[in-house]
Amino acid sequence: MKYDIKLRFEVEGIVEKTDVIGAIFGQTENLFGDEFDLRELQDKGRLGRIIVEIRTKGGKSEGEIIIPSNLDRIETALIAAMVESVDKVGPYNSKFELIEIEDIRAEKLKKIIERAKGILSSWSKEKSLDIKEVINEISSAVKVGEITEYGPERLPAGPDVDKDPNLIIVEGRADVINLLRYGYKNVIAVEGATSRIPETVVSLSKMKKTVIAFLDGDHGGDLILKELLSNNVKIDFVARAPVGREVEELTGKEIAKALSNMMPLTQYLKKIQEAEQAIAKNVIAKEEKPIQLEATQQLVQITLPQNVLEEIKKLPGTLEGVLYDNNWNLIEKVQVRDIIPKLEAYEDNKVAYIVFDGVITQRLLDLASQKNIKMIIGARIGGINKRPQNVDILTFTDIISS
């Protein structure tokens, strides 16, 4: 069928469906000859079965009619007008009125188009092959076995830190794991040292032909380099992750690019000094009003359940996170890379606390504020320009050392 003729009707009395159908056939018969006789058209398959829905209300009958039509547009319009001319059903006066003529093919086409859009959308959302994830999965079986603990401080390190003439120094265990994943085995971590670099790193650096400090692309990386130099660690070259990125999250290509762009220490320090001088001159040249700086660190007092404390001790180096509800009940364990999409999928107020082995970033803080998350506990705090008032943040060091 091409069209559905839809009409509504009212009858000044109580009638049955058969009465309505009989009135339609009877009062349209021979109006335009046999060619437009409804029974003949039904027999030839040009019209479908008449569908009647009827209701009684206050001694009257009302309802809707659908007449499927396989005629052309002009003939279908004529049939609709013929049915509208029916003014009696049985002994009662009646009124038939056209609601619409629905183009079934157009509606079917709309449904097909909408379905095609849905198929395309779900197809686009399907996980495409991510080479990094493939490498991660393949290497996960060996990465834990390859990582070693070096020196009396039990520092995370690759298996070749002793025998390789070159050494890569990174900040934390997660950085070591990521470099091992891509085949860099001459790597050792200072474990986020901010005041005293382990003596093992100092002595090991002096035994190596070339030492590379490979650090995060944020202020934290600047601080680690400063501590390395102030503790007399031998540094020959400096490599940095892209601005705002962490070594632990880089792909193999990004690691290779960062290391290929490393600079000799003297050249790097000169570049930094020139940049600082340029900034200083620019600031002096401008007359600016004093700016009131907000305190960036707030005192957070909270009692953590024992099971959460135990979980925090296990997380470093796993690149995993845990989501808790308002009562510190476990909601889900996730990979660090999946935390933001997971949070976006949850309803507001569902997650109250996040504990994860990763960097607390501005993007994560903004999303947490939007989702009414109370607290984030992470491995480190990245470059944060604006701290939401409704989200407390702590690091593993804050928890474990307290």
From Swiss-Prot:
One annotated GO biological process: DNA replication, synthesis of primer
Pfam families registered for this protein in UniProt: Toprim_4 (PF13662)
Keywords: DNA replication, DNA-directed RNA polymerase, Exosome, Magnesium, Metal-binding, Nucleotidyltransferase, Primosome, Transcription, Transferase
GO cellular component, one term: DNA-directed RNA polymerase complex
Enzyme Commission numbers on file: 2.7.7.101
GO molecular function: DNA-directed RNA polymerase activity; metal ion binding; poly(A) binding
SUPFAM superfamilies with a match to the protein in the record: DNA primase core
UniProt keyword annotation of Coiled coil present: no
Family to which this protein belongs: Belongs to the archaeal DnaG primase family.
Quaternary structure, from the entry: Forms a ternary complex with MCM helicase and DNA. Component of the archaeal exosome complex.
Name this polypeptide is given: DNA primase DnaG
Taxonomic source organism: Saccharolobus islandicus (strain L.S.2.15 / Lassen #1)
Designated gene of the protein: dnaG
